[in-house]
Amino acid sequence: MGSAPAQIPTSFGHELRACLRCRLVKTYDQFRDAGCENCPFFKMEEDHERIVEVTTPNFNGIISVMDPSRSWAARWLRIGKFAPGCYTLAVSEPLPEEMQHLCQEERVQYVLPKRM
């Protein structure tokens, strides 16, 4: 996780989705083609149904981060160790329990979203 930049969304319309774990924002097609740079264990590029499970079109705000490790905003949003890219400020729905268990198995942190 971290050093190679994530794909930048090719469109900023209604087709944007955010990863429910890391909050990376890309289009559905980008998740289908390359998966999530921060969450490769979801294997979205192999299982296209998983994209709908682990991403959401419902999110608030977008921040672009070029150097997450040096950005106070990235650290405040808890994305300081993720790949440079576009992230949402907040998602309003949790990752499905099955995927939360997968995160535990992979020993990666998952923080439930705050109530909005």
Swiss-Prot record:
InterPro entries, A to Z: RPABC4/Spt4 (IPR029040), Spt4 (IPR009287), Spt4/RpoE2_Znf (IPR022800), Spt4_sf (IPR038510)
UniProt record, GO biological process: regulation of DNA-templated transcription; transcription elongation-coupled chromatin remodeling
Compartments where found: Nucleus
UniProt xrefs under SUPFAM superfamilies: RNA polymerase subunits
Superkingdom of this protein's organism: Eukaryota
Gene3D superfamilies xref list: 3.30.40.210
Entry GO MF terms: zinc ion binding
Name of one Pfam family that matches: Spt4
Zinc fingers typed C4-type, residue spans: 19-39
Entry keyword set: Activator, Metal-binding, Nucleus, Repressor, Transcription, Transcription regulation, Zinc, Zinc-finger
GO cellular component: nucleus
Annotated function: May regulate transcription elongation by RNA polymerase II. May enhance transcriptional pausing at sites proximal to the promoter, which may in turn facilitate the assembly of an elongation competent RNA polymerase II complex.
UniProt family annotation: Belongs to the SPT4 family.
Protein name per its UniProtKB record: Transcription elongation factor SPT4 homolog 2
Source organism per UniProt: Arabidopsis thaliana (Mouse-ear cress)
Lineage of source species: Eukaryota, Viridiplantae, Streptophyta, Embryophyta, Tracheophyta
